């Protein structure tokens, strides 16, 4: 399993548009991709679960990938977070 921590920089946090884009990115991989905030872990492939975390600006999340293509998944997701969140 590979993971990274990220502090959300955008004012609106993870709202509908970037959440949808993030789910789309996560679905490209066979690995299970998750996000954790305040001890609650949700799959990145489930939009409503992701939105239920209520991630806001300044929150620190942990993104993890576990599976055969976890290295590629983490690289792609980290780049997505840095570019969009």
Language-model segments: residues:
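Compact, glycine-rich, soluble single-domain proteins
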Residues: 7-44, 48-57
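Short charge-dense sequence patches
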Residues: 1-2, 23-31, 74-75, 84
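Intrinsic-disorder/low-complexity, polar/charged segments enriched in Ser/Thr/Lys/Arg/Asp/Glu/Gln
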Residues: 1-5, 60-62
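C-terminal structural segments of small proteins and small subunits
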Residues: 52-85
